[in-house]
């Protein structure tokens, strides 16, 4: 028996006036998800705990059965591992954004117009960076999907106890990175990052990719903004923890990195962006091929577009993307036999918030021996009446392993 945990990143939301006080999921036409709800057991889930606002990283760790309060060291190492950068003990890794700044250093677009092409060429220039005051520190950049990138600092005397440079909203300069403790290492690392942000603008503002973007009235990716400092985490292999053969199918470096640290096989895909313009047909075909033809028996799958729309405040686009996932992906996945599917989100990304929130997310479990409840619709409101009631992310793997007959009895 095989199992799938399919996470629609950021799908949860709050009622919107433009949808007659419905969420984008409620407003969406999702006949396939509704059919799954009718044929499955439903409920709502707090990825970590009620009211706790999870990151995508901490939410996925919890969903995979890890305690994020114990294993989470920061976002950076997971992002780095996800794009193929080997992070070694002593390294400090960061998630970065390619962003747009004006001549006064004001950030005018935190995601550089959701840039899709040219970041590899920009990174080639950034990887020649040497800071005059810190020539012994190796600076490693690597592009990820879209506007995302990673930074790894390698050298002696570094610390992950530093703040983020991300201003969170446009119209401000990058935040000054400050040490979060009084150590020499934290002060040194903060100084390196502040100098690096300034240097990045100097190095790439006139890059040919950016000059072309300006000519095309597109925001240039002319500054790097790091956040999510972290050192190498210690994560028990998922295959050892649950005695499964697992794989991760994801679009973004963050989720692939979590999968790598968890020892999962990473199934890479072409032509996926992590946005609403991603190639859902490729994602669908990859899932079906792996489930039918590989020897993996457990899959973590992440589809990211709804989260992007939530962050950008695009209500219609979020609704439409959910509908497209239903039409393209779920219409075929629901036909899989001898497979348990756990469909959920990692967190809510409400249009009104433009960020994550602590609202619980909807859950469906379908499969051969699921106890079917009387819920017939997949939405945040409808599934709250379901047979699973309200669970936490930490419950997901226990439930799935039990259904798949991989669980062990507790007690005599």
From Swiss-Prot:
- Tell me, what is one Gene Ontology molecular-function annotation carried by this entry? phosphoglycerate mutase activity
What pathway is this protein a component of? Carbohydrate degradation; glycolysis; pyruvate from D-glyceraldehyde 3-phosphate: step 3/5
Its EC top class is isomerase
Record bears the keyword ATP-binding: no
List the GO biological process terms: glycolytic process
What InterPro entries does UniProt report for this protein, alphabetically? Alkaline_phosphatase_core_sf, ApgAM_prokaryotes, Metalloenzyme, Pglycerate_mutase_ApgM
According to its UniProt record, which reaction does this protein catalyse?
A: (2R)-2-phosphoglycerate = (2R)-3-phosphoglycerate
Keywords, alphabetical: Glycolysis, Isomerase
Could you say which protein family the record assigns here?
Belongs to the BPG-independent phosphoglycerate mutase family. A-PGAM subfamily.
Explain the purpose of this protein. Answer: Catalyzes the interconversion of 2-phosphoglycerate and 3-phosphoglycerate.
Q: Under which name does UniProt file this protein?
A: 2,3-bisphosphoglycerate-independent phosphoglycerate mutase
Biological source species: Methanobrevibacter smithii (strain ATCC 35061 / DSM 861 / OCM 144 / PS)
